């Protein structure tokens, strides 16, 4: 789906649904990045200034600029991993049973980012950047192949459609939202109609319908010029490879002239006479049976070909030659211009619209009346006037074919009523009758078109098609590969409605709006504090303005913290709000001393500001235009009446859901973290979405369904960890000794340095340590 800023609001019906990444472009796309930026750098000073110089990025010439701008995400391993919630009893669930879920995973991806359009303001105190992100599947680290593992769950795309249609359905005598979906699906049905009516197959059927009359006229003209010599006519029609010397009007009337080998067809005069005897039911001029036989032969039907070869004494090659002449020579010379004239169109490309709004292309006959093979329309007329005629209403639209194509039925136009958004806009125009002028249609035409699309097609075409899509693709419940769920989903119902939006839960290779942070140049305590999130300093999507505050999720915190704070505020981009981390105690990451923080309990409390009515659920419904709720894993901290009482499979333990962070206070680097969030979808309370005979009639409202677990972590390379460990040990032991010398000089000087240390240790240990060596940092 199209990514939006958190304060963006759009009209429910004007954007279709919105479905799936679409719906969840923010969720999971933001990683809590480890700050590994200092890992590749050897210590070059033993002062606090060295640490500051390595941490602070206030210009493009800063020591660590390239790492900060994205290089570190390539050299180290940043991981986003997923567990899918799989519904194991979908059929029983649809029949009213409690849903049973299992988790499937992990599916591991390497995450890389890049900062572009970087500018520094306020003398380097502020940095603005645009961040792009990409995910790379790690097959060697994933026990499951996302292309092969199939997952069944609630369909975000369909859920979004229901959610967005429900308010309007309530205004229509409290109509179930699904019924409104079926009515509006007339847009997709009309597009299917016009796709067929604009196909070569339909054009050929028009030629089979119009050619006989035009052929008879030209035949009589030639025969008149031959003084009635019928025998000569058939001889020339069958075998002449160039214009005959006798008679006039032969152009387009010679079957052998279209033979690329310049050879005669050798069709006998007897066969020619049978072919053009309209009373013969096998004749190409016979509109009762013959034309159907020839259409089916064109479509490759062996039975029809056998009948024609037998009854007309023709070979298969001769039948092919006749069809080639009839459709590609005679039709181009005589029929195409005639059809353009009766349809009042500039060329044959508008032939389908002509038939759809007038029926003239088939002389007032519906395509549904033809009985050829693969006939797609057996539920009655599809043309607007002919459908009304079939129910006893005489309707003749006043809009011209060309204007109808331009204003209503041009699929490449986003305002076309062949897609959901366009049809909704057309319906909205009915609130003020004058606005139909923008479509250049009269009120009468508009009402008839609306009635046709939403009411007259409802039972015969719209409903069967939607139910067929349920069966083929799924509706509320779908089964897709994990790769489709994450990245590449295309929803069959969205496609049918002409909604050109992806339905995946994630987006790859995204580019965010610009954000601005404090660099820490003027105040170390402000290092990496967010100033502006995607062009907003205040989040207006909530009840009242919420100030953007907290450290960004880059893993870099203020350096040189001799007394680490008891709490830290992070701006959590996944849920678009500040969250709190609380100091727990000492910890170690691969031998390096760190401070362990945890996400505080009750991180998503009831809040009118953040529109949270159920503890544990971060409600993003208004932001995503979809009933979506973010929680910790397994809906931890969500009351049982909204979680474990309604489904099976949750593991609601603190060990499963805890979010730790290990902070190295000297450099301000987070050396470890494991962020765990979960996407959940819901059918809102008091929803009137489904009728009593719907496939989904047993779905309960105000029930929350787990969809996807998202984990985010990172790992520094072992060489960087080894370097970091060794340098910290030297710092602790040597104090004022210029460690940088040891790091730069070769093995001999290293041994000498260590000897000097042993000799002077008693004196040196009384001295105060002053310098720290630059270590890993990641932005």
Curated annotation (Swiss-Prot):
Heavily glycosylated. InterPro entries: CD36_fam (IPR002159), Tumour_necrosis_fac-like_dom (IPR008983). It is found in: Lysosome membrane. May act as a lysosomal receptor. May be involved in macropinocytosis and fluid phase exocytosis. Binds to the anionic phospholipid phosphoinositol 4,5-bisphosphate, but not to phosphatidylcholine and only weakly to phosphatidylserine. It comes from Dictyostelium discoideum. GO terms for cellular component: early phagosome; lysosomal membrane; lysosome; macropinosome; pathogen-containing vacuole; phagocytic vesicle; phagolysosome; vesicle membrane. Belongs to the CD36 family. Its main location: membrane. Pfam families: CD36. Glycans are attached at residues 44, 86, 95, 114, 117, 201, 239, 262, 266, 277, 369, 410, 440, 508, 543, 601, 619, 651, 693. This is Lysosome membrane protein 2-A. The keyword Glycoprotein applies. Residues 1-17, 754-779 are cytoplasmic. It is a multi-pass membrane protein.
């Amino acid at each position: 789906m199209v990514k939006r800023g958190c304060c963006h609001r759009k009209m429910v019906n004007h954007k279709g649904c919105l479905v799936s990444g679409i719906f969840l472009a923010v969720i999971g796309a933001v990683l809590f990045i480890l700050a590994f930026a200092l890992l590749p750098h050897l210590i070059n000073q033993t002062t606090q200034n060295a640490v500051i110089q390595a941490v602070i990025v206030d210009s493009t010439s800063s020591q660590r600029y390239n790492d900060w701008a994205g290089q570190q995400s390539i050299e180290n391993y940043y991981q986003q991993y997923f567990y899918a919630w799989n519904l194991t009893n979908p059929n029983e669930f649809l029949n009213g049973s409690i849903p049973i879920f299992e988790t499937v995973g992990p599916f591991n991806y390497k995450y890389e980012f890049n900062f572009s359009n970087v500018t520094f303001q306020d003398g380097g105190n502020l940095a603005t950047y645009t961040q792009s992100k990409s995910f790379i599947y790690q097959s060697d680290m994933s026990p499951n192949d996302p292309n092969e593992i199939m997952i069944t769950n609630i369909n975000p795309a369909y859920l979004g459609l229901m959610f967005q249609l429900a308010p309007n359905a309530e205004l229509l005598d409290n109509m179930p939202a699904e019924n409104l979906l079926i009515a509006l699906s007339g847009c997709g049905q009309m597009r299917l109609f016009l796709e067929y009516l604009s196909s070569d197959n339909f054009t050929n059927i028009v030629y089979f319908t119009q050619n006989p009359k035009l052929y008879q006229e030209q035949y009589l003209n030639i025969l008149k010029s031959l003084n009635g010599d019928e025998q000569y006519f058939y001889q020339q029609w069958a075998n002449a490879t160039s214009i005959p010397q006798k008679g006039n009007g032969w152009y387009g009337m010679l079957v052998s002239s279209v033979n690329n080998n310049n050879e005669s067809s050798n069709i006998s005069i007897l066969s020619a006479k049978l072919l053009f005897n309209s009373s013969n039911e096998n004749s190409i001029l016979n509109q009762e049976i013959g034309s159907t036989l020839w259409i089916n032969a064109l479509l490759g039907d062996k039975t029809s070909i056998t009948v024609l070869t037998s009854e007309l004494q023709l070979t298969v090659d001769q039948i092919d030659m006749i069809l080639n002449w009839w459709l590609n020579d005679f039709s181009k010379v005589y029929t195409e211009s005639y059809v353009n004239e009766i349809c009042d169109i500039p060329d044959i490309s508008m032939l389908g619209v002509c038939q759809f709004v007038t029926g003239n292309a088939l002389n007032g006959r519906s395509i549904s009346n033809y009985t050829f093979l693969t006939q797609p329309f057996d539920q009655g007329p599809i043309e607007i006037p002919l459908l009304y005629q079939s129910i006893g209403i005489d309707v003749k639209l006043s809009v011209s074919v060309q204007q109808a194509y331009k204003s209503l039925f041009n699929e490449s136009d986003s305002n076309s009523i062949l897609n959901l958004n366009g049809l909704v806009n057309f319906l909205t125009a009915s609130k003020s009758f004058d606005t139909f002028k923008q479509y250049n249609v009269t009120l009468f035409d508009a009402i008839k078109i609306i009635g046709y699309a939403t009411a007259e097609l409802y039972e015969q075409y719209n409903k069967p098609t939607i139910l067929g899509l349920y069966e083929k693709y799924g509706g509320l419940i779908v089964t897709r590969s994990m790769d489709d769920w994450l990245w590449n989903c295309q929803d069959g119902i969205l496609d049918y409605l002409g909604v050109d939006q992806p339905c995946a839960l994630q987006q790859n290779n995204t580019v965010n709006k610009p954000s601005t942070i404090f660099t820490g140049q003027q105040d170390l305590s402000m290092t990496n504090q967010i100033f502006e999130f995607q062009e907003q300093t205040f989040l207006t999507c909530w009840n009242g303005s919420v100030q953007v505050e907290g450290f960004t999720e880059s893993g870099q915190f203020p350096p040189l913290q001799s007394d680490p704070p008891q709490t830290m505020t992070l701006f959590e981009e996944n849920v678009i709000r500040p969250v709190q981390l609380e100091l727990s105690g000492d910890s170690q990451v691969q031998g390096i001393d760190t401070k362990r923080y945890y996400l505080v309990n009750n991180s998503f409390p009831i809040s009118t500001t953040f529109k949270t009515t159920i503890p544990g659920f971060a409600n993003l419904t208004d932001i995503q235009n979809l009933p979506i709720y973010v929680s910790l894993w397994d809906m931890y901290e969500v009351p049982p009446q909204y979680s474990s009482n309604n489904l099976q499979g949750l593991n609601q333990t603190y060990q499963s859901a805890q979010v730790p962070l290990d902070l190295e206070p000297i450099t301000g680097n987070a050396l470890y973290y494991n962020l765990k969030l979960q996407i959940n979808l819901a059918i809102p309370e008091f929803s009137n979405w489904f009728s009593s005979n719907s496939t989904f009639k047993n779905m309960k409202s105000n029930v929350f369904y787990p969809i996807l677990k998202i984990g985010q972590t990172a790992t520094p390379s072992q060489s960087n960890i080894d370097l970091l460990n060794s340098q910290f040990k030297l710092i602790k032991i040597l104090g004022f000794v210029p460690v940088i010398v040891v790091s730069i000089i070769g093995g001999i000087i290293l041994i000498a340095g260590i000897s000097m240390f042993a000799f002077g240790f008693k004196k040196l240990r009384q001295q105060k340590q002053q310098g720290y060596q630059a270590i890993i940092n990641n932005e």
